[in-house]
């Protein structure tokens, strides 16, 4: 569900204190803010209000979008005892019940609202923050298949790459749904899931969902897009960068398959690409060993967990 906060500085404050809640309780809950003169005012004013509900069904905070053109456009509850944006996903209380085989991870709460209204009850959002280890642990309780559907601007592309890096050694099967840019007055502008559904409809989104790339294909395409593969120097640079990605893949079969595809893209033999990946793999192992040695020599670092990649064995 959703609601709205009135265009008032103290409507919630007056209502809640009238019902017996103290100002300190409202402050602790992130519903009011203290000013410099010692007074208090409502945090959320003239906003569309979206309750954030945890997987147990409890309201733990709020997301919001301004109704007029004032700033900030989006605002969430501040960190509280019950609400930590690193540890919660908007819409997961509903998406955990989906019959679909995967969960769609979006950027914004309104993306989730629109997708659910369109029949995609497997959509969640990361509350305006980059995907965190804590959120992936939460997701792993309900699915092993993720579809990343971030905005198609530069920030969204960067968020996708960071999420893929975080999920690289996880047990998730990860795909990327790339939303096309929208042509308006001769210029291409960004588009999010909310925009796309409203303009193109659920069937068009379903087609994009079915055609989602896996995470490795997406990252390889991003790397290839940086280089003119008709130029020899660019091809060499591409091979060096893509080999680092391929060397990070956990499975030998997976490395073999994508090494062949990278070789084809670069116009070289699979054997030459394989040698480049092997060199990158050896450099990667050497870097990890040096990092472990530095950690062992530093007492403070030695206290940190040695395994930094994502694992779910203890969940």
Residue map of PLM features:
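Conserved residues at beta->alpha junctions
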Residues: 3, 106, 126, 150-151, ...
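Short, surface-exposed acidic
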Residues: 1-2, 20-28, 33-37, 205, ...
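Phosphate-handling DNA/RNA-contact segment within nucleic-acid enzymes
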Residues: 8-142, 146, 158-160
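Cofactor-binding loop segments of dinucleotide-utilizing enzymes, especially the Rossmann-like FAD-
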Residues: 2, 62, 151, 179
